Amino acid sequence: MKIKKTAGRQPAPNRINEEITGVPEVRLTGIDGEAIGVVSIRDAQNLADEAGVDLVEISPNAEPPVCRIMDYGKFLFDKAKSAKEQKKKQKQVQVKEIKFRPGTDENDYQVKLRNLIRFLEDGDKAKITLRFRGREMAHQNLGMDLLNRIKADLDEYAVVESFPKMEGRQAIMVLAPKKK
């Protein structure tokens, strides 16, 4: 037995023209959206042919099925275009990471703080990683003080999503932008 494969094509979501079978009559809507009424399937296809467009089954489960006279290619194009616009409007939230050390100097701290503010204003989350090396592990309280200082400095821009916690040799805190 041979298995029939469709080469990546998905079936059309709506039946069109001659694909609409098994129903004697349909509820028809015209090109401009005006209701024509219940007509036989043959009359509906003739009206669509006269207009030079397609007969598209909109609601197959209705009784009788609802069909519309329209340009199906244009309909699919507009549908794809609107879906693309919706996707474009969605903002993908990213997590930006800034790395600190317990001995980060004041100027470096201010530069990294400005970057954090910029990330949060753009609507992205910020992950703050504080890495301890060597003997710095003995002074974890200095690192936690630094994370608390960052939290206090960014209080008007962000809310803490995950509070500072140690993971191996680093302390991690995640900030999310405040809702406006």
From Swiss-Prot:
Its main location: cytoplasm. It is found in: Cytoplasm. GO terms for molecular function: ribosome binding; translation initiation factor activity. The keyword Membrane does not apply. The keyword Cell membrane does not apply. One of its GO terms (biological process) is ribosome disassembly. Pfam families: IF3_C (PF00707), IF3_N (PF05198). Keywords: Cytoplasm, Initiation factor, Protein biosynthesis. GO terms for cellular component: cytosol; membrane. InterPro entries: T_IF-3_C_sf, T_IF-3_N_sf, Translation_initiation_fac3_CS, Translation_initiation_fac_3, Translation_initiation_fac_3_C, Translation_initiation_fac_3_N. Transmembrane segments: none annotated. Belongs to the IF-3 family. IF-3 binds to the 30S ribosomal subunit and shifts the equilibrium between 70S ribosomes and their 50S and 30S subunits in favor of the free subunits, thus enhancing the availability of 30S subunits on which protein synthesis initiation begins. Monomer. HAMAP family: IF_3. PANTHER family: TRANSLATION INITIATION FACTOR IF-3 (PTHR10938), TRANSLATION INITIATION FACTOR IF-3, MITOCHONDRIAL (PTHR10938:SF0). This is Translation initiation factor IF-3. It comes from Shewanella baltica (strain OS185). The gene is infC.
